[in-house]
Amino acid sequence: MKGNIWTIGDVQGCCAPLAELLAHPEIAGDTDSRFWFAGDLVNRGPQSLAVLRRIMAMGERCTAVLGNHDLHLLAAYAGVRKPSKSDTLDEVLQAPDAVDLIDWLRFRPLAHYEAGHLMVHAGVLAKWDVAKTLALAGEVEQALRGPNWRKALQKMYGNEPATWKDDHTGGKRMRVIINALTRIRLCTPSGHMEFATKVAPGAWPAGLVPWFDVPNRATRDVTVVFGHWSTLGLLMRPDVICLDTGCVWGGALSALRLHDRKLVQVKCKRFQDPNGD
């Protein structure tokens, strides 16, 4: 496909900053461009419904991977999980076009690879190369797109197993895949996921490292693009790009043109206090 690719970080229901970002001359003038969204389109911000409608209307110009908040919306719609006090999903759940929006969301990928860039919401396990990541993401995608998608969502909650084994089956297998792609931040050097620690970057306890610094990570030969980690903020290395710059927390919404790493940001109003989600 032709056109520049602009990758956008976590929107989290902040439609006004998204509209401002897309109207930026550098982006709006790029008429053949395509847009990648690194997940968490919804929740915590005030306009999740407007965000979904706008991104859905982009059609084939848009590729959006599922984040943990997007999966939470699916679970809330399915009756698997009740919204919490900090959620801002009621407008979507009660919308007249909710069925269409939920069906569109169910058919989003959990991983996307193109032109040397692998996009996921949170990260990948060190043992997984690009092919493995796409294959495992595909297993979950198939379940979410199938007739029993509500039952599939019941299996995704929990922190265990914390590591990958090829012989995992059923709910354990799905849970590891979802947790790695949509929730991971820190790991042990051997690749065990750790979800209890919520500290500022660089202040994590001995024995824990960011998932992208686990030794011998199999995706280090490509660039992994992700969001999810607002306290980490903007990170640009040859092998990883983090684009969650805390839009909903009063930070910025960021877009990066992949081929030359041109960065465009818009400042955002603070809608909620950071709480590690």
Swiss-Prot record:
<dbReference type="GO" id="GO:0008803">
    <property type="term" value="F:bis(5'-nucleosyl)-tetraphosphatase (symmetrical) activity"/>
</dbReference>
<dbReference type="InterPro" id="IPR004617">
    <property type="entry name" value="ApaH"/>
</dbReference>
<keyword id="KW-0378">Hydrolase</keyword>
<dbReference type="Pfam" id="PF00149">
    <property type="entry name" value="Metallophos"/>
</dbReference>
<dbReference type="InterPro" id="IPR004843">
    <property type="entry name" value="Calcineurin-like_PHP_ApaH"/>
</dbReference>
<protein>
    <recommendedName>
        <fullName>Bis(5'-nucleosyl)-tetraphosphatase, symmetrical</fullName>
        <ecNumber>3.6.1.41</ecNumber>
    </recommendedName>
</protein>
<comment type="function">
    <text>Hydrolyzes diadenosine 5',5'''-P1,P4-tetraphosphate to yield ADP.</text>
</comment>
<dbReference type="InterPro" id="IPR029052">
    <property type="entry name" value="Metallo-depent_PP-like"/>
</dbReference>
<comment type="similarity">
    <text>Belongs to the Ap4A hydrolase family.</text>
</comment>
